[in-house]
């Protein structure tokens, strides 16, 4: 009887191991081409017993919540008046921006990402609402804190991407994902959906790749033909056939920080 129970338990463990994570359910996207295809010993001495009342102690207050990142130095909106100070504040908050004092596309895209995270109008301009929010902003909380030291998190609701390296937030990018609508292009029809779930970077192409549905720059594929890639147009709302568009200003260096096998969480 004991032997039978032991074999039954062993069989159950084996079944659980064989049916665990690591496979995708449902139809494969391998043949689908998008537009973006396109974490001391010693002696003892007896001493007289004395009673001393315990000293009162006060527990230190908890540190402010910063999403697991170091707290930023306090600034005022007036401190962010110059383009370079504005860019430096965005960079300190891990938005992907070039700190050069130029209000270029890199700065605009970083501002859009900040506006998306904070529920502000997505203008890409340093309006008073933006500088007021930047002055007191903190790093966001992780979506998947146990997802691995190096990982990509994609927030479909807010249309932003987070890159973590060595357990710390490294970059925040604005993205544009699948519209969720039906499309037909040159006889190919489908639903423009960016799949939710847990994936990994499977393969990549360096430089431009031209597909039936458009062009992709430095695509990194994580689900069949669905990729993270650079594109000249990254609207502030979903606009792709399913891929995750990132700004060209980020797409040049982003792949070097995301090796093949990196976990990708789409939520």
Language model features: what each stretch is:
Residues 1-25:
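Secretory targeting and sorting signals
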Residues 21, 26-31, 53-58, 141-149, ...:
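Exported/periplasmic cell-wall-interacting domains
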Residues 42-66:
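Extracellular mucin-like PTS domains
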Residues 83-87, 108, 112, 131, ...:
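Extracytoplasmic/secreted envelope proteins and their assembly/folding machinery
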Residues 88-95, 112-120, 135-139, 166, ...:
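Sec-exported extracytoplasmic/periplasmic mature domains
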Residues 140-180:
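A structural motif detector for short, solvent-exposed N-terminal "entry" segments of globular domains
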């Amino acid at each position: 009887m004991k032997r039978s129970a032991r074999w039954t338990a062993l069989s159950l463990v084996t079944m659980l191991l064989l049916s665990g994570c690591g496979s995708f359910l449902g139809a494969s996207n391998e043949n689908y081409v998008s537009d973006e295809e396109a974490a001391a010993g010693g002696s003892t001495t007896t001493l007289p017993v004395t009673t001393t009342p315990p000293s009162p102690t006060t527990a230190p207050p908890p540190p402010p919540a910063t999403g697991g990142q170091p707290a930023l130095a306090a600034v005022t909106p007036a401190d962010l008046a110059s383009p370079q100070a504005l860019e430096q504040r965005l960079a300190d908050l891990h938005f992907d921006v070039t700190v050069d004092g130029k209000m270029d596309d890199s700065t605009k895209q970083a501002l859009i990402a900040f506006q998306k995270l904070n529920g502000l109008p997505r203008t890409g301009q340093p309006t008073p609402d933006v500088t007021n929010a930047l002055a007191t902003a903190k790093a966001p909380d992780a979506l998947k804190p146990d997802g691995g030291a190096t990982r990509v998190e994609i927030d479909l609701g807010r249309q932003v991407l987070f890159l973590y390296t060595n357990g710390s937030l490294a970059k925040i990018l604005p993205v544009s994902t699948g519209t969720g609508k039906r499309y037909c292009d040159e006889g190919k029809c489908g639903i423009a959906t960016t799949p939710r779930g847990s994936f990994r970077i499977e393969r990549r192409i360096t430089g431009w790749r031209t597909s039936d549905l458009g062009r992709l720059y430095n695509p990194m594929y994580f689900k069949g033909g669905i990729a993270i890639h650079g594109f000249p147009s990254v609207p502030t709302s979903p606009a792709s056939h399913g891929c995750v568009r990132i700004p060209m200003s980020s797409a040049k260096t982003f792949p070097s920080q995301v090796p093949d096998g990196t976990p990708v969480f789409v939520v």
